[in-house]
Amino acid sequence: MKTLTFYTLLLCAALYSNFFDCKAVADAELPKLPDDKVLIRSRSNCPKGKVWNGFDCKSPFAFSKK
């Protein structure tokens, strides 16, 4: 049982430190994307045959089945 507690604490510490690393990166000025890399913000920007899954354009079969 002590081993499980140790690993749980270790995982929490890793996630906690990762949170601050991510925040620091988000607060820093991020590099701009090249002109050919356009951020997809809505399903209307998806190419034909792809659908919006909330994050990016994917094949409808990639996330329709659970």
Swiss-Prot record:
Annotated localization: Secreted
Signal sequence, renumbered to the chain: 1-26
Keywords of this entry: Antibiotic, Antimicrobial, Chitin-binding, Disulfide bond, Fungicide, Secreted, Signal
GO cellular component: extracellular region
Gene Ontology molecular functions: chitin binding
Keyword Secreted appears in the UniProt entry: yes
Disulfide-linked positions: C46-C57
The keyword Nucleotidyltransferase belongs to this UniProt entry's keyword annotation: no
Primary localisation category: secreted
Any one Gene Ontology BP term: killing of cells of another organism
Function description: Possesses antifungal activity against phytopathogenic fungi such as P.oryzae, R.solani and B.cinerea but not against phytopathogenic bacteria. Shows weak activity against the insect pathogenic fungus B.bassiana and against S.aureus. Binds chitin.
Designated name of the protein: Scarabaecin
